[in-house]
């Protein structure tokens, strides 16, 4: 008898493994084997649509067709679509152990008809195990693919990767001094309002000048006679000496050192108000009019008002005392350049008086070292880079008592001021770095020994400086020969150096030769435009080197970004890219 859908067949359970039954059934001359799964468990395939309830029909001919009745071991009859087999401890007929089928999830299919492939839609149960068994290597419905959450890699500054544009770099000299150092070195500007009094603080161990606590007074404000009697003479003397408003001061410092001649020197640094910018005045030798008592000098230093705003204490400069017969130093003058036209080649500088560090000109006194030309240069250049040490060694020409000496401080802590000629090229190359709009530099440099002298000015009229004009003759040339014999022409691609940046490629825009009216040695400088930057600068000819010849020496392999882009632009502008340059550019690209 051929099996058909809905018929019942006795099966033989061969093995039971983890809720699955391995069964065999013989139908005529053919034998079938398979695995029956427990559909009541939630592991594996579950939620299968149950079959329609079959009619209770005696299938005695089916059993007779095998020629034998089922044995006792084969008494358990398995039904397709039924639940788990009955428990082993109770042997009951299959009809009584068959549970009620759950309500069908999908409409039941008529007996004997199967779809070509199981329908699948959202929320539908998994197909029947026999359907999966009959569809090996065929189309099998799969659940929808689950969404895989991918974490997006965070870019720098949350930028779109397609819009990563290299920002332009502005080649400007870096600031060497901080705000405190600049306020210490530059003269304070006069503020419209009254100067703010320094905050009175009590500091431990402030030396012999620390405040003494006054004895308590009664509520009516009148001190008692006993408290007055207990006061010592020293307390009353210090209370009378102290000003109305107590200001914390620094302790008195004494420093002893030996001179090359073997003599011992002692420098006494008097007490000063915290935050004052008054420079250190070393104790001078006794004068003809008689020496003053150190206590009197100490009292005068206390009573001197502090007219400078509160700031940090400047660095102490220990200089040797100046001989008594030294002349007074000339006043300091700053030169302000005026904007030049397109056709002008002679820059005109206006001279104006530069105030002292504390904002006013002090009265005449034995010439202190801090006010001399060398001391002034040292004060203006202190705190900057190591190259400023050359600035202190400028030769000082002999100056008269009423002579005017030009002095220009390096702006923003610029170095390269070591030159004997007026407006030296080394001091103008980095200080005159400007933007593409061609803004002129703030100051020029004139060393004291070579400046033009003005008419004699009385000491009372030092506050006003007569108009003074210094004309510097400049000439534009197309090419120039350096000291080592190389020729630099307009349009050349060269390497240039600015403080705070690596060697950077640039194009020469103009070459200027300068000379003073009195025939002093000229200087040679070039105006260059930087590749990859909108800025232009004035550099000394001696600081320029050819781009191709010095490529291996100047190229920095560690720099990326705009530096690499500027190198590529300079190589293309040179109209030929040497093989070694191309190899270096492509070797380190990422």
From Swiss-Prot:
CDD domains tied to this protein: PWWP_PWWP2B (cd20153)
Biased segments, Low complexity type: 376-385
Matching SMART domains: PWWP (SM00293)
GO BP annotations, alphabetical order: chromatin remodeling; positive regulation of transcription elongation by RNA polymerase II; regulation of cold-induced thermogenesis
Pfam family, one: PWWP
Biological role: Chromatin-binding protein that acts as an adapter between distinct nucleosome components (H3K36me3 or H2A.Z) and chromatin-modifying complexes, contributing to the regulation of the levels of histone acetylation at actively transcribed genes. Competes with CHD4 and MBD3 for interaction with MTA1 to form a NuRD subcomplex, preventing the formation of full NuRD complex (containing CHD4 and MBD3), leading to recruitment of HDACs to gene promoters resulting in turn in the deacetylation of nearby H3K27 and H2A.Z.
Protein name in the entry: PWWP domain-containing protein 2B
Organism of provenance: Homo sapiens (Human)
Classification lineage: Eukaryota, Metazoa, Chordata, Craniata, Vertebrata
């Amino acid at each position: 008898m051929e099996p058909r859908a809905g018929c019942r067949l006795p099966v033989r359970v061969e093995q039971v493994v983890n809720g699955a039954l391995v069964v065999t059934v013989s139908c005529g001359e053919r034998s079938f084997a398979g695995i029956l799964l427990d559909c009541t468990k939630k592991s594996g395939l579950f939620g299968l649509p149950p079959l329609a309830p079959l009619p209770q029909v005696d299938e005695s001919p089916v059993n007779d067709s095998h020629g034998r009745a089922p044995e006792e071991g084969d008494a358990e009859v398995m039904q397709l679509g039924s639940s788990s087999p009955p428990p082993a401890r109770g042997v009951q007929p299959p009809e009584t152990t068959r549970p009620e089928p759950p309500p069908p999830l999908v409409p039941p299919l008529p007996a004997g008809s199967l779809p070509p492939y199981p329908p699948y839609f959202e929320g539908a149960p998994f197909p029947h195990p026999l359907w999966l068994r009959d569809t090996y290597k065929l189309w099998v419905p799969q659940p929808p693919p689950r969404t895989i959450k991918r974490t997006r890699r965070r870019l720098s500054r949350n930028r779109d990767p397609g819009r990563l544009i290299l920002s332009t770099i502005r080649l400007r000299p870096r600031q060497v001094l901080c705000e405190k150092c600049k306020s210490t070195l530059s003269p304070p500007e006069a503020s419209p309002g009254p100067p703010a009094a320094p905050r009175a603080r009590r500091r431990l161990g402030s030396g012999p000048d620390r405040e003494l606590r006054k004895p308590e007074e009664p509520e009516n404000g009148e001190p008692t006679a006993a408290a007055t009697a207990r006061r010592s003479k020293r307390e009353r003397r210090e209370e009378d000496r102290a000003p109305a408003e107590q200001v914390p001061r620094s302790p008195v410092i004494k420093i002893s050192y030996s001179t090359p001649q073997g003599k011992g020197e002692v420098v006494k640094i008097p007490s000063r108000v915290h935050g004052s910018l008054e420079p250190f005045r070393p104790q001078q030798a006794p004068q003809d009019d008689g020496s003053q008592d150190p206590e009197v000098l100490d009292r005068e230093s206390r009573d001197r008002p502090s007219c400078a705003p509160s700031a940090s204490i400047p660095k102490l400069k220990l200089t040797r005392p100046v001989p008594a017969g030294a002349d007074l130093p000339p006043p300091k003058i700053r030169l302000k350049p005026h904007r030049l036209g397109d056709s002008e080649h002679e820059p005109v500088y206006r001279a104006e008086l530069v105030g002292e560090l504390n904002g006013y000109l002090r009265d005449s006194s034995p010439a202190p070292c801090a006010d001399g030309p060398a001391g002034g240069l040292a004060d203006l250049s202190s705190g900057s880079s190591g190259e400023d040490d050359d600035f202190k060694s400028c030769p000082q020409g002999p100056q008269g008592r009423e002579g005017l000496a030009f002095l220009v401080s390096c702006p923003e802590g610029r170095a390269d001021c070591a030159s004997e000629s007026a407006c030296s090229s080394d001091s103008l190359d980095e200080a005159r770095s400007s933007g593409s709009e061609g803004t002129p530099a703030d100051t020029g440099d004139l060393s004291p020994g070579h400046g033009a002298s003005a008419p004699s000015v009385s000491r009372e009229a030092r506050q006003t400086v007569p108009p003074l004009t210094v004309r510097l003759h400049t000439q534009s040339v197309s090419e120039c020969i350096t000291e080592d014999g190389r020729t630099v022409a307009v349009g050349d691609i060269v390497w240039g150096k600015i403080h705070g940046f690596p060697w950077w490629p640039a194009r020469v825009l103009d070459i200027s030769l300068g000379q003073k009216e009195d025939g002093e040695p000229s200087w040679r400088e070039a105006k260059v435009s930087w590749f990859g930057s909108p800025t232009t600068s004035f550099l000394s000819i001696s600081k320029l080197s050819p781009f191709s010849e010095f490529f291996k020496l100047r190229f920095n392999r560690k720099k990326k970004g705009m530096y690499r882009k500027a190198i590529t632009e300079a190589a293309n502008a040179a109209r030929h890219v040497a093989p070694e340059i191309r190899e270096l550019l492509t070797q380190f690209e990422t």
